[in-house]
Structures are given as structure tokens and as C-alpha cells.
């Protein structure tokens, strides 16, 4: 209906120095049925950084518009798919006025807000009359931002500025989104593997036997490594004496294959390189090729209705053909060239990252094992 009944006021929101700021391109879902791929460029802000700009109101057709006041708000919310039972949450919810005629840009209508963790607002203009275009500056000083922005398949962490023109009939509103990065101040430790290190000084992880696929079933053998701590806004990264211990996975199929998969540490910044190696102790399995993947796992919803979604952020082939006993394959995985998500966690969702080693034999059977790593953002 908005095609036939346009609001009498156009609202434009501009952030200070927006053009000179760093931007990120975020995939958005088209509001129509064509599902065309779209991207939106959003300015990036940090925790504690002030947010200011100018709101311009333009009256259509030079008509006078009465209003009950003009308000500007900055909002941060966690949004989840409507089918995930978010209505059971007792947390503070975002309430959407049914009388609001808003231009919401790329807001995903499939998702409901389950937690509004940030909401600050103040009046730009008292009740009165608009006869011509007017501009109003706004500023939110030292704005605290609890979570990093995130756009997943089932959950979003969204930040936006909302301007509302309050009226007796239908309110007119407009939002403008921005993106938030949270940086960890940890100093990264050396990312190397010493050839003289022994198992007694490493973080050993006892890997179980691989399970082969039958016809179409994949059986995953899970690592017994302790899970890395979940994080909220800043990851609690700690390095003892600045010397992280390497992680070693012993992987094997009885009387067929025995591999040592080792990498330098379990915590990486998004700009680092994962350095490791694969050492073959026993090779009676006819291997076709081997892949290394970095998998991002999103878990959303309440515990009774938890939904897990995996997406492969990185995949590349590290070996083609069979190997021989004693062969070593070096690994260098550069993280900076990919759009990765740091580990995140809150009451409604968490995001974890895993290294996955996949072996495919000549019969097409797949053997794989995963080990959790912690990713965090640094400047």
C-alpha cells in the first residue's frame, strides 16, 4: 500500500564523516519475491565511539505537516527467525508500533527482535508544524556497544539509528544501519612449530578412530579437546608466558591409517596465519585427496529448541593422491584473505569456529575430524 500512499515527509539520515569511514558490504535479502542478491555498504564504528550526524526532513508538495514531536534513537538488538520460538523469552523486547509507516531499508522481516540490549533516544524537535525542509543535528556520546555486529542465517546482531516523526494518525519513521567491530587488545604470540617439541609439552588431543561413510551416511568422529571458552564482546585470550602450546590430533583407522595433525595454537586473530603440519605414521589406506576446511558453526535459539547451522568459510585441497609413511605435509592457512567471523556467545546464540580435516579414499568414502579454534579481532 505504500506505493499508493506515500508519507508526506521524506527523512534522510547522514552520519558525520560517513564517506571517509571504513565500510563493510553486507548481503541483504530483497523484500520482494525475486530474491535477488543485494549488498549494502555500512559504516563501521567501535565500542565507546561517539555517533553523530544530521537528520533532514523534507515536506512533500510544500504542504504543512503537523506533528507531536520528532525523536531520534540509537538501537542495538538481537534478531532471530520467527520460527525459533523467540516469543518465550522474558527479556526486554523491541516493540514495533502497528501504526508505524516506516522505511526500514534492508531489515529482514523474517526475524523478530528477542533482545534490545541498547536503546538511547532524545527529542530533536517539540510538537509543532513543518512547512519546509529542516535539518537537525544529533549526537550520542561515547556510545557503549556490547556485541559485535553479526548477520547469520538464523540470527542477526543489528545496530541502527531511527528517526520518528510522531503524529496523531500514523507515525513516520526511518532507520539507518551501521556496523560495529569489537577489537581485542591482546598481543599475539609467536605462531610457529618447533621441530624439537615433544608430546609431553603439547596440548595432546586423543583422536578416536575415523568412521567411514556407508552409502550416503557420514559419521563424524569428534575430538576430545576441551571446548574453548565462549565470548561476548571481547574474547578472554590469555597466553602463558606468551608461548602458546601447539595442538596435536592423533588420527587413525585401525591397521589402515595413522596421522598426526598438528597446528601451532588454538587461538588466532583474524589477521594471522594458521601454521601446522600433517605427518603420516601409517598409510595403508588408498587416499584420493585430503582437504582442510574452516567451518563456522552458528547455534541459535533457546536450549529446548536449539538450531545449529554450519557454513564453510575456507576449503582447500592440501594433498592429491596417496602418501607414504614418514611423509610430512606443511600447512599455512592465511586468515586475512577471508571474511571470517570471530567467536561470539550470548544467551540467544553462539558462533564457534572449527578446523576440519577431511580424507577421501578411492572408493569415495569420507573420513573427517574437527577441532575447535578461537578466532578474535585485532586492530
Swiss-Prot record:
Q: GO: which molecular function terms?
A: protein transporter activity
The GO cellular component terms are: cytoplasm; cytosol; endomembrane system; endosome; fungal-type vacuole membrane; retromer complex; retromer, cargo-selective complex
Name of the protein described by the UniProt record = Carboxypeptidase Y-deficient protein 8
Q: Which family does it belong to?
A: Belongs to the VPS26 family.
Q: Where is this region: Disordered?
A: 84-108
Provide ranges: composition bias, Low complexity: 84-107
Q: Where is the PTM Phosphoserine found along the chain? A: 216
Coiled-coil ranges from the UniProt annotation: none
Assembly and oligomerization: Component of the retromer complex which consists of VPS29, VPS26, VPS35, VPS5 and VPS17. Component of a retromer subcomplex consisting of VPS29, VPS26 and VPS35.
Function text: Plays a role in vesicular protein sorting. Required for the endosome-to-Golgi retrieval of the vacuolar protein sorting receptor VPS10. Component of the membrane-associated retromer complex which is essential in endosome-to-Golgi retrograde transport. The VPS29-VPS26-VPS35 subcomplex may be involved in cargo selection.
Entries under InterPro entries matching the protein: Arrestin-like_C, Ig_E-set, Vps26-related
Q: Which domain of life is it from?
A: Eukaryota
Keywords noted in UniProt: Phosphoprotein, Protein transport, Transport
Pfam families according to UniProt = Vps26
- Locate the transmembrane regions by residue number: none
Any one biological process term the GO annotation gives: endocytic recycling
Amino acid at each position: 500500500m505504500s506505493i499508493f500512499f506515500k508519507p508526506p515527509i521524506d527523512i534522510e539520515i547522514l552520519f558525520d564523516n560517513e564517506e571517509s569511514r571504513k565500510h563493510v558490504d553486507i548481503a541483504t535479502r530483497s523484500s520482494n519475491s525475486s530474491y535477488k542478491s543485494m549488498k549494502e555498504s555500512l559504516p563501521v564504528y567501535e565500542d565507546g565511539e561517539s555517533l553523530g550526524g544530521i537528520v533532514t526532513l523534507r515536506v512533500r508538495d510544500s504542504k504543512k505537516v503537523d506533528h507531536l514531536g520528532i525523536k531520534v534513537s540509537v538501537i542495538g538488538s538481537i534478531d532471530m527467525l520467527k520460527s525459533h520460538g523467540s516469543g518465550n523469552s522474558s527479556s526486554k523486547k523491541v516493540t514495533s508500533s502497528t501504526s508505524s509507516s516506516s522505511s526500514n531499508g534492508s531489515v529482514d522481516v523474517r526475524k523478530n527482535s528477542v533482545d534490545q540490549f541498547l536503546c538511547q533516544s532524545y527529542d530533536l524537535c517539540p510538537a509543532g508544524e513543518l512547512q519546509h525542509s529542516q535539518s537537525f543535528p544529533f549526537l550520542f556520546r561515547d556510545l557503549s556497544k556490547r556485541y559485535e555486529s553479526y548477520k547469520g542465517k538464523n540470527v542477526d546482531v543489528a545496530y541502527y539509528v531511527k528517526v520518528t516523526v510522531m503524529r496523531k494518525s500514523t507515525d513516520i519513521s526511518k532507520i539507518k544501519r551501521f556496523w560495529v567491530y569489537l577489537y581485542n587488545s591482546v598481543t599475539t604470540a609467536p605462531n610457529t612449530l618447533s621441530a624439537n617439541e615433544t608430546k609431553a609439552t603439547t596440548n595432546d588431543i586423543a583422536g578416536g578412530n575415523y568412521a567411514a561413510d556407508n552409502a550416503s551416511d557420514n559419521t563424524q568422529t569428534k575430538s576430545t579437546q576441551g571446548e574453548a571458552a565462549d565470548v561476548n564482546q571481547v574474547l578472554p585470550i590469555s597466553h602463558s608466558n606468551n608461548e602458546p602450546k601447539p595442538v596435536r590430533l592423533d588420527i587413525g583407522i585401525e591397521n589402515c591409517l595413522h596421522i598426526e595433525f598438528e597446528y601451532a595454537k588454538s587461538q588466532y586473530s583474524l589477521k594471522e596465519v594458521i601454521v601446522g603440519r600433517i605427518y603420516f605414521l601409517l598409510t595403508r589406506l588408498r587416499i584420493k585427496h585430503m582437504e582442510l576446511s574452516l567451518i563456522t558453526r552458528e547455534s541459535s535459539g533457546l536450549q529446548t529448541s536449539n538450531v545449529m547451522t554450519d557454513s564453510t568459510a575456507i576449503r582447500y585441497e592440501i594433498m592429491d593422491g596417496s602418501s607414504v609413511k614418514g611423509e610430512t605435509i606443511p600447512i599455512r592457512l592465511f586468515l586475512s584473505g577471508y571474511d571470517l567471523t570471530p567467536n561470539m556467545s550470548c544467551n540467544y546464540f553462539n558462533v564457534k569456529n572449527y578446523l576440519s580435516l577431511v580424507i577421501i579414499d578411492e572408493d569415495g568414502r569420507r573420513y573427517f575430524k574437527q577441532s575447535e579454534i578461537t578466532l578474535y579481532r585485532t586492530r
